[in-house]
């Protein structure tokens, strides 16, 4: 039997798909790639935007049309956040919530045996535990992703994720370290600690993210640790100082911004100002001293009430920080969130235009940041081979490079000298 997965959304979803792939492989299934025939098609959905829901439905409809005898499965955040809507999507033979995935294999087998359509969505409950979905290997990735936390206790005006993911639940440290040892034994040298609210790790168990990072760095074989998205207001000076002392931690910080305008941040119900965000960036740079450090972020354009002046202020803030990479999104009016009913909704054309302008500016900033690294040296994790000797990869700072590495293979770490940015990657040479 063959199963095909389609994953939307964040690194947590990527990790969870890896766990599901492993579950099916362990029970005799072969994992098919996109475009290949399969007996089961599973979409691990993202519901951050309405567009994400549409993509999930469109993919399953197409697979059902092309493979009328196959079993189709809708799982992930979409059915968990909007169970009634997802349950009505009849092209999915199994609709499965985030808390019901341990039974996904049994339910798929029932459907293969002729069982009628199944809807299994358990609502989140106070006091629920972290769902263990360990992964031993990521078939198409040279870095490993370890899910360490689930859920979010915040209530940002635009975000449906607390509804989809429930309250903060931290994974047991021993379980994380055991999985990390398995991954290093399988040859992985870089691990990404992923979570829905990474700085919240340990809030419910009496520990914290710094303690976890220190323990992960002590695992033999691991050479690089990378952090997922961080909320700036949760990074205390002590937290920052201790992180900067961990040599194996990649000095790249993805600090969630959403807007560089304090008035917009307040409407979003974010709990920091633009000035406080900048202070955290300064504290991180000070903690690293002369060592290089990079910053990446996300930014929303066209949030309700955002004026042209607010937007321009946000753009200026991006210049002030000097981000290596900015993920720019037009605001998506999401049902089930407070912002859905906010007045002063920005017209779709204006949201798209502001996104275009900000993307162009973010690329200019990126070029300026990368120009400063020409001639410097760093380590690169070799990832995708473009030819027999040419590889793409990322430095510790998360600079994308292309390098000729004869005699090396994907998953190895090599030392390089950085060259010019070609608009997609930095050209590098082994030194």
Question: Which residues does each predicted region cover?
Answer:
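Short flexible coil/turn linkers enriched for glycine and charged/polar residues
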Residues: 139-141, 152-153, 249, 259, ...
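Conserved SAM/AdoMet-binding glycine-rich loop
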Residues: 72-73, 81, 86, 185-308, ...
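Flexible glycine-/small-residue-rich
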Residues: 7, 229, 257-259, 382-384, ...
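Short, acidic/polar
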Residues: 310-316
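Hydrophobic, well-ordered secondary-structure elements that form the walls
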Residues: 255, 298, 318, 326, ...
């Amino acid at each position: 039997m063959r199963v095909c997965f389609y994953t939307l959304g964040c690194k947590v979803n990527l990790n969870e798909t890896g766990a599901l792939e492993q579950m099916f492989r362990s029970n005799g299934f072969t994992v098919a790639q996109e475009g290949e025939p399969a007996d089961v098609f599973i979409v691990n959905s993202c519901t951050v935007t309405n567009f994400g829901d549409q993509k999930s439905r469109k993919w399953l409809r197409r697979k059902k049309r092309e493979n009328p005898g196959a079993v189709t499965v809708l799982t992930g955040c979409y059915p968990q956040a909007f169970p009634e809507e997802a349950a009505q999507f009849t092209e999915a033979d199994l609709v499965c919530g985030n808390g019901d995935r341990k039974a996904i294999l049994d339910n798929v087998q029932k459907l293969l045996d002729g069982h009628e359509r199944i809807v299994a969505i358990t609502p989140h409950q106070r006091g629920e535990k972290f769902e263990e979905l360990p992964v031993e290997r990521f078939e198409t990735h040279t870095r490993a992703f370890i899910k360490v936390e689930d859920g979010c206790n915040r209530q940002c005006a635009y975000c449906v994720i607390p509804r989809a993911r429930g309250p903060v639940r931290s994974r047991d440290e021993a379980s994380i370290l055991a999985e990390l040892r398995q991954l290093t034994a399988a040859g992985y040298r870089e691990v990404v600690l992923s979570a829905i609210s990474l700085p919240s790790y340990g809030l419910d168990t009496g520990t914290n993210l710094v303690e976890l990072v220190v323990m992960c760095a002590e695992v033999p074989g691991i050479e690089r640790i990378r952090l997922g998205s961080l909320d700036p207001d949760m990074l205390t000076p002590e937290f920052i100082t201790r992180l900067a002392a961990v040599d194996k931690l990649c000095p790249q910080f993805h600090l969630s911004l959403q807007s560089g305008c304090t008035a917009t941040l307040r409407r979003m119900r974010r709990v920091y100002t633009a000035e406080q965000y900048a202070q955290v960036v300064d504290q991180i740079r000070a903690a690293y001293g002369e060592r290089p450090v990079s910053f990446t972020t996300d930014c929303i354009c066209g949030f309700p009430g955002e004026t042209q002046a607010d937007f321009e202020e946000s753009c200026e803030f991006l210049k002030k920080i000097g981000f290596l990479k900015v993920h720019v999104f037009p605001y998506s009016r999401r049902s089930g969130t407070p912002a859905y009913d906010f007045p002063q909704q920005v017209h779709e054309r204006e949201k798209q235009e502001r996104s275009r302008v900000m993307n162009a500016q973010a690329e200019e900033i990126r070029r300026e940041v990368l120009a400063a690294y020409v001639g410097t040296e760093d380590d690169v994790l070799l990832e995708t081979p473009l030819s027999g000797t040419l590889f793409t990869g990322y430095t510790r700072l998360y600079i994308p490079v292309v390098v000729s590495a004869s005699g090396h293979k994907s998953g190895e770490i090599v030392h390089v000298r950085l060259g010019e940015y070609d608009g997609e990657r930095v050209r590098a040479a082994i030194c």
